[in-house]
Amino acid sequence: MESLSNLGNAMSSVLSETTSTTATAILADPTEALSSVVALASDAVSKATSDVVPEHTPTSWFTIILWLLHRISSVLYFVIKLTTITTPTFLFNIFSTSLTVTMNATTLVLIMLFMMAGVTWVVRYRYLNMYSRLPPEPQRKEPAVDLFPETQEEGVKSGLASYFDEFLSAIKIFGYLERPVFHELTRSMQTRKLIAGETLNLEEEQGFCLVVDGMVEIFVKSARDGRRSSSGPSFESDDEEGFAPGRQRYQLLTEVRNGAPMSSLFSIMSLFTEDIQMHDTDDDDSPDPTPSAPGTAMPGYPMNANFQQSNDTLPSIPGTPLSDNHVMQRGMASAESLTMSPLAHDSSRIPSLSLVNTRPAVPRRPVPKRLNTTSAHPDIIARATVDTTIAIIPASAFRRLIKIYPKATAHIVHVILSRFQRVTLATAYNYLGLSGEVLQMERNILKHTVRQLPNHLRGDALDRLKEKFKRERERIGEKEVEKGIALHNAHAARRRRSAASLRKEVALQAYSKRRQSIVTATPAFGTRRERPSPDMPSPGDLLTNTQQLKSGPASQLDLARDATSPRPQRNLSPFSTPRNAHVSLDTREALDEDDMFRESVLECMFRAIGLTGNGSVNPDSTQASPRFVPTDQRRSRGGPGHTAFGFMDAFDPFDNDTESVTSCGFSSSSPVPNPQLLAHDMKDEVEIVFFPKGSVLVEQGERNPGLYYVIDGFLDICVPGDDSSHDLLQSSAKVDHGHDSATGADAFGANSSRFPEPNMNNNFGAEQKKGKQGRRSVALIKPGGLAGYVGTISSYRSFIDVVARTDVCVGFLPLASIDRIVDRYPIVMLTMAKRLTELLPRLLLHIDFALEWVQVNSGQVLFREGDESEAIYLVLNGRLRLVEDQKDGGMNVKAEFGQGESIGELEVLTESARTGTLHAIRETELVKFPRTLFNSLAQEHPNITIKISKIIAARMRAFIDDPSRMGLKDNVVRSYKSSSTLNLRTVAILPVTAGVPVVEFGNRLMNALSQVGPPNGATCLNQAAILNHLGKLAFNRMGKLKLSQYLADLEEKYGLVVYVADTNVNTPWTQTCITQADCLLFVGLADSSPEIGEYERFMLGMKSTARKILVLVHQERYSNPGLTRQWLKNRMWINGGHFHVQMAYTSNTVPIHPPTKRFGPSLKQRVQILQAEIQKYTSRKVRHVPFYSPDAPFKGDFHRLARRLCGKSVGLVLGGGGARGIAHVGIIRAMEEAGIPIDMVGGTSIGAFIGGLYARHADVVPIFGLAKKFAGRMASMWRFAFDLTYPSASYTTGHEFNRGIFKTFGKTQIEDFWLEYYCNTTNISKSRVEFHTSGYAWRYIRASMSLAGLLPPLCDEGSMLLDGGYIDNLTVSRMKSLGSDVIFAVDVGSLDDNTPQAFGDSLSGVWAFFNRWNPFSSVPNPPTLAEIQARLAYVSSVGELERAKTMPGCIYMRPPIDDYGTLDFGKFDEIYGVGYKYGQEFLQKLREQGVLPLVEETEAKKALRRTMAPRRASI
């Protein structure tokens, strides 16, 4: 109560004060009074409260609330006042005010002009000038040359490691050797030390010699005994008379260094075939001959029944002493000494491999030929230049090897024989022009392969067969007859089934049983198919494979009985006669006459190739017992090897098992079968075919499709009449071979038995040319003869043509069957090797000693710049690159060399230093042709040097006349691009990263290569194919030798080998793909990340120097602008360009990297998935179609890539000419309608514009609309007038011109163009021509169209660029340097006025003016100042144009557009129609002349190839 009283007193005092104050204030101002009253009241209340209420009481919160209410009321009051009083008052005052502005017209116009200028500036320089603000994208610089230093310099190793390295390097010539074979060959090896100057008579050395350390000079006895040569080496001192009786002179052949063999390929074949006896033909008039008694004929001479033909076999070798008596006597003496040698005694246990029957001998006169000596090194001596260590493998080691491991021996002989043909014969034939000697050997070997049919098939039976063919010929007509008529074979289906589908099963089963037999040492077969006798060939061979399938155990028992006693079975033949007692047929009544022909023909074939069946079938040796396993075999099968030479599987090109070549050693592998039984078993493999006169059965340079046995008629062995030594080394890219498989299919497929169809003289291309030039006959094959023997057995290309001289009936055995026989029976290969060694002329023998087979690894340097020129190199397979050092420290690629090309002739002949450094891009096989051999041949056979002189002269002429090499020295793109894509033999397809469908890509590329690829086909390899062929051990240490040889054989067989890296990164197969490739294709998905992939990092780690190409795979035929630049930005090693390919593929839904567990990315991914699912049902379905789909297969992207890899690209070069260039559009349309694919496009001026449109869209429809739109802009005079400026540098600013081009191309870069494209400009800052292949397309196309005076130059990296037509208006030479095979060049430039002028030594301008307007003046008008300047500017272009017209492979086109001016863009439709009409007429003429490279015609030509087309006619 006391507090309340105090409060009341306080309130009363406050009210009294307030009342007095209010009264005073009201009198002054009522408004202020109200506010003051409120303030005083508040203060009074607060004062009273503070006096009454103590601190920290609840009344303090009441004060705060009152203060807040006061503030809120103040704000509400202000807002209400603003919206109800202040704002309406302000608006009322504004709208009620009236303003009057007064100005004159000038001010108004100026204001409007300023406003328009501002808008114009914004539009002109901010919107329309967008092209000038693009981010800078300079041209991509050409990548530097990859030349990595050698990992191992020559001569660094020493001691024991060096010894083994040199030894292994020398025996590489044998191919791969398994551990037991290697041990057997080297366990009796001897070494010998030679001091400097010591001479070794190799003629007395019976073995294989090689240099381990040091250097040896190889000399040959000179054939010019009576003549002295000042330059040839001579041993005339008294100390050396013992080695040179009668002062014999010697010629230096070669120098042998570390790791090289002293023995030649001929020597090795001689060592392997010492015990093989030669046999003669079997005529009707006499039984089979045998070697005559001593004194009658020299041992080893081939016998000839036709004495009158002996003169034809004499080889025409200048200076070769074939008839010297003392030489003959010395050869006979050496032969006798050999028979008494202890080595001969050791061979007594060797199973007989004789090819001669044991009937009484009939003495015959020997055929004159090369002296047959028993030495493996005839007329050869060696002299050590320094202290030298040599190793000798004696001949006894080779004889033991034949006895123990005959299958391995056959493979080694096959390798040596193949290299002998590739190295010696091919070099002599192609490079030295020794076609006569090689053809003489072909002719002589025919006499050893004649086997006559039995008499009962020569008379009425042969007439009935010819009558069948005659009736069929009349029925089907002459056109079909040209392809051949085959006798119907009712058992063909059974043959194909037994040979293809069931062969693998039987081989695997037989192999497993054989392994069981070896391990358990028990009889191998106890099942229904058990082998009754160990005399039979081993299971899985040719006989067992087919007979087990056809006849079961009964027929096998019969076969075994026949094999053990073949002669009684012959006597039971009802067709046998005393005259032909060696031929017999089966007595089954169901055997008809056609089967008789097949069986007899096949038996004659087998006897001709060496399967006589007279060898010891059951030799008395432990090797014939199946219960005995040799020591080497027990070691090899006892577990992993304990030496560096691990046990390896066999090289079997047709089996998929992994049987070792040594596994057959215990049973002599191949007891020579009875040819009658083998023929009976394989009679369904042979075809009886009729060919009319003039048919070409085998063409020079192609692989033989099989063996031809002449039944009736005559075959002619010919060579082209103009030059008998065509280039067989390079013929693989020109001539169709006998293997049409483009996918590496099994050789025993359904088409393996089809006989090849002949090429007639009226066929396409080369056949027409040959028919016109004619052929030169070398020999005649009569009935009973064999054609294609050497080429078929050795699987090498033919040196000759085989042509039907008359209507001929032949028996044809396909190559697949021959290969199986050769693989199973080594005697076939040994027989041919023996025949070749016996018939080899002395000149070829000495060349064989001098030539060296060299194998180099990837990156290895053969010689360096400045080295002495010691040898010429010939490339067998692989790839080499020649580079030269530049002054700035870089390297410039001069050339690349592929298969069949030669390097270094000019330096060797001029004895000058090397002009560059030569290194191997990949593993390469070479022939080293030493300078010493050239000097020796030049002295004894000067005519040989003519061939090499012609090669050098032709090469220098091509170098001088090649316009592509002129003016390109300072160009950013090197001239080596011309050789970079030519003669490619291997291509590897690698993904950029995992997940790229390289297998599908490879399949599509192979499909394209089969249509437009090399004539001899292409094959595709992946890891599965390699493992299927070589087994699971294909990639180990020793397996690499086997693999490299197999890959080399494929390169020799096919024109292109495609490797597909379908494995992980760090696998041996991926490494093999990179090391074996001439060109690497990195395939990436364009929509994926452009980061460097793991495969690329792996390749960079391997330091590959091969050509590298980037292939971007798109879902649609369109590339987003700038996408390609992102891919190329970090890949400076891409030095072969890039390709855009359209291929539908399914993207990999499984992420390559494991997803992270962060919340953000996971949520984002989930939202994207939900959005995609929702849009699937809610959005309108958009039909995704490519921007352009090719209407013909040959225009597809894979065909374009295939043509580029094969060097068959078609280029289109468009010239400049202003509005006349509209005709380009019409010509392109005509080319598309004619079916001509365009792979590369180049242009100048208006040609650069039209070419850029076509390169971007690859279709004529879009370029027609865009070109017409641009022509409309250029025809507008208003745009031209608005672009005028003060003519300091040009009459226009160039803006409108830039806008027109930019609106056409946008931000697209040249790298984004679908086709490969370039344009040229004239760099007036550096006075040179420049070619542009990267950067913004609109800039360089605009620069190429910048006519001086009309448009200003375009600035690019400080240089000023003008129209490229000032230097070269038709860039054919540039297109040729890029590797185009066929070039279509369209010229639309103006023609110069060549009217003769005679206005005198001085000229009055006034007279010239009136003369121009005087219609009666007869004096021609002098040129104006502008015309003189224009002609001066195009002076160099005229010369380039004339060279382009004569460029090989260039098709020059010039439509009739001379009536149209440079600026007549308004006549678009008219000029377009002129070009289209001209293109149609011109291409129609080319089609009629047969010049037009139509794809349809190419396919038709391939359809006529006898190795590809199916059989058309069959009786």
Swiss-Prot record:
A motif (DGA/G) lies at residues 1363-1365. It comes from Neurospora crassa (strain ATCC 24698 / 74-OR23-1A / CBS 708.71 / DSM 1257 / FGSC 987). Intracellular phospholipase B that catalyzes the double deacylation of phosphatidylcholine (PC) to glycerophosphocholine (GroPCho). Plays an important role in membrane lipid homeostasis. Responsible for the rapid PC turnover in response to inositol, elevated temperatures, or when choline is present in the growth medium. A nucleoside 3',5'-cyclic phosphate 2 binds at residues 835-955. The keyword Amino-acid biosynthesis does not apply. The gene is nte1. A nucleoside 3',5'-cyclic phosphate 1 binds at residues 670-789. GO terms for molecular function: lysophospholipase activity. A motif (GXGXXG) lies at residues 1216-1221. This is Lysophospholipase nte1.
